[in-house]
């Protein structure tokens, strides 16, 4: 009976596979939105103010960071919790493939969240004159919470590895 439960629990990890596949659909949706934004900007590029163009570029950078985060979570999550990826020898292989454990994945996700939060904060500061001071304060507090959390997770991970 114990053996049955252990095998069933171990096999249940495959329930994560469709979730990771769903993340690839989310990446497709993000890609569509990315190009929608580019196609929206191109006809208006000469009429746009520099600040507006910078805001659009920050939005595109933000989408690229989120896309990278999705790929990282998708691939390393699959490798850590479901099954190892079997990539043919002749094909290009990501340098971190097979090397990222759940601790380093957490740190990379935290660093990505800080980067994404930084982009959002920069976009808000570009329009700071239209944002109430108390809202700006909360945006900075939330961003600093992300930064401190990322540092704390990295520090704790380093302490537990030694």
Swiss-Prot record:
Signal peptide: none annotated. InterPro entries: UPF0114 (IPR005134), UPF0114_bac (IPR020761). It comes from the Bacteria. It is a multi-pass membrane protein. It holds the Pfam family UPF0114. The chain crosses the membrane at residues 10-32, 53-75, 136-156. The lineage of its organism: Bacteria, Pseudomonadati, Pseudomonadota, Gammaproteobacteria, Pseudomonadales. This is UPF0114 protein PA4574. It comes from Pseudomonas aeruginosa (strain ATCC 15692 / DSM 22644 / CIP 104116 / JCM 14847 / LMG 12228 / 1C / PRS 101 / PAO1). It is found in: Cell membrane. GO terms for cellular component: plasma membrane. The keyword Transcription does not apply. Keywords: Cell membrane, Membrane, Transmembrane, Transmembrane helix. Belongs to the UPF0114 family.
